């Protein structure tokens, strides 16, 4: 699945809802707030699924 910058995603194995902030070296860069600070991590696309609040776009 292709994600766009500002899409909401979450890890398939469970975890926080995150926002896609970009792509680097074939990885999806994400950020989220854990209640104390902003966290960031890069994931493979196949590790992510759409979040509950994912933006609806015309992906044609």
Which residues are covered by each model-predicted region?
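Basic/aromatic-rich interaction segments and small domains that mediate binding to polyanionic partners
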Residues: 5-47, 59
